[in-house]
Each structure stands twice: as structure tokens, then as C-alpha cells.
Amino acid sequence: MPLDTLRIATRKSPLAVWQAEHVAALVKARHPGVRVELVGMTTQGDRILDTPLAKVGGKGLFVKELETGLLEGRADIAVHSMKDVPMELPEGLCLPVILDREDPRDAFVSNTFKSLDELPRDARVGTSSLRRQCQLRHDHPHFQILDLRGNVNTRLAKLDAGEFDAIILAAAGLKRLGFEVRIASEITPEQSLPAIGQGAIGIECRENDPEVMALIGSLDDPDTHVRVAAERAMNARLNGGCQVPIAGYAELTDADTLRLRGLVGEPDGSLILRAELSGPRAEAEALGRAVADLLLHEGAGPILAELGLGPDADRS
């Protein structure tokens, strides 16, 4: 029996609501007779705003409560930023849809300077991401890298209040919320390799729910899905988390070939390891594991092990 109402679990931040409303609009455009309801939920990551994410630790800080809502039947799908989704999903849930990817790059935001290269030696740069902090410290050791938490609006307000000379945010979030004008410049992947899944929106649902699958299946973008699959396979092999700088970015160099770049670094930026491979898109996950193995061969294992992560760490 077809569903007449689709309940979407979402965080309550402006960006999360935008993403959920975007999915709702796509569903209604394809299935005009279906009602869509947003079910707002507060996650652990939303509650803890005074501590850097890397120190909070744990997996699924921004998704666990949404997944519980799915398993308890309070929602039919959950909409996530793919960079927040852990590698292992709870039993009974799946991730069948990844939408067409928005700009995956990091964005340089400043009211005074146009790019990283224009910043003075002791500039105050805000970002919550260890991945960004590591790459910034490696290339610009004289910057003051400061932690920055909160939603996009809060982070921009802190910049405008003079707490920072510049902040680094995901370009996708700024563009989705209508803040593209705040982007002074985009940061190339060569300068700052993006987070795994950055710019991509995923839809999670129950495995045994064919009615829901029928409603959302056509929203999947195969090119984005295969790119994110390669990135996530790399991260799964490394058994990484937000406590260590890990980056991964896959591109289609032609219709059938994937190029995947991966990075693991010391949090203080003193060491960055990089690896890159290309291969058939049909073998995206194998490509991800191969890039992870190259990083491990280069010495990523000890970096990960120091933080209780890596292939040999307990995954519980």
C-alpha cells in the first residue's frame, strides 16, 4: 500500500532544515499526492557547543537520535550531511540515496581579507574541523587556529563580532543558506582536501520499508553515490573518526574512472600523509580500501593508533 505521508527526521539547525525541506520538495515534485512532515530532533552534537568535537569523541554525534527515530517508527526517513554519517549503520537501517553533490570545497570567509595568502602571520582563523586545522597548521604555522562551534549563522556572527580575522566553512552550507556572498574565496582541494562526503546529502531509511524506498529511490544521483562510496570505503578501512584529521575526495575523471585522493595527518599539522589512485567506478569501494592501504603503508597507522583508532582498534 503506497504511503500517503512521509515523515522526515531532521536536526533543527537552519542548514539541516534546509536539507530536509529540499528533500521534501524533491519528493513532492515526483509524488504530488504525498504529504511530507518534518520531525525535528536534537542530537548530542547540537547539545554540546562548548567543547571541540574532537574532544567529545564518539560516532554519530549528529545522527544517532535521528536513527533512533527511524528504528522506533517515529520517522520514515532521516536526512543527513554525509560528512556526519558514521561508516557503520545500525542494524536494520540503510542509506539508499545520496543526492547530487553541491560544491565540496572549503570556503574562506573574511570581512577584511580575500584569501588565506592575504592573512597576516598571526591571523586568528576559526574552524571546528581537525581536518582543516591540521592542513592550515601545516601550510601556515604562524596562524592562530582557534576552535569555532555553532551553526552557520552563529559562526558568521562570531566573525562579524571581531572574534576572528577569518573563518573556514563548507562552501556547500553557505551556498544552500543563501550566504554565497560571504565567501571571499573557495579553497582548492590542493590547499585543503575536503571531508569525506562533504557537500553531499544522504537519505537513511529502514531496510524493510519498500514503500519508502519506492518514494525516494529516484532521488539518488549515481555519480555522487559512487564518489562518496569510494571516500567512505577509505575511511572505513582506516576506522577513522573526528578525533583525527582524515580527508578524502573522489572525482570522476571520465564516465567510468574515479580518482581518489586521501589524507591523514597529525592534529598539530606536523605531519601530513597523502595518497592517490585512479580506478574503475565499478570498483569504487576497492579503490577506497586501496588508498587507505597506501596511507597505512606511509605511516598512518601509528597516528590513528595513538588516538585509539585505525584498522586494529575496537569498533564498538
Swiss-Prot record:
It comes from Thioalkalivibrio sulfidiphilus (strain HL-EbGR7). The porphobilinogen subunits are added to the dipyrromethane group. This is Porphobilinogen deaminase. Its cofactor is dipyrromethane. Keywords: Porphyrin biosynthesis, Transferase. InterPro entries: HemC (IPR000860), Porphobilin_deaminase_cofac_BS (IPR022419), Porphobilin_deaminase_N (IPR022417), Porphobilinogen_deaminase_C (IPR022418), Porphobilinogen_deaminase_C_sf (IPR036803). Binds 1 dipyrromethane group covalently. The modification S-(dipyrrolylmethanemethyl)cysteine is found at residue 242. GO terms for molecular function: hydroxymethylbilane synthase activity. Pfam families: Porphobil_deam, Porphobil_deamC.
